[in-house]
Amino acid sequence: MRVISLKTLKDYWKAESAAEAELRAWYAEAKNAAWKTPADIKAKYRDASILKAGRVVFNICGNKYRLVVWINFKAGIVYIRFVGTHKQYDKIDAETI
């Protein structure tokens, strides 16, 4: 998959160093993945939440952080829409961000 944008993740882990290792691991896995359907994601990330319109929420560091992405399965592109703490996540609408 093509992940847009690594810079978003880097900026976040510079501010929240506790999230760095797991965000780096997620990025490496996503970059090497070939997800064609939401079921492909659930096979690897059982605790991921599949939302409407291609949105997926990943739990990072045991759900301390949340990563929201929009996936264009046909094009093989993952767009990072949000990364933040669970508390910050509770203040957004993951289906529209």
What are these regions (language model features)?
Residues 1-64, 72-79, 86-97:
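Basic, Lys/Arg-enriched alpha-helical interface segments
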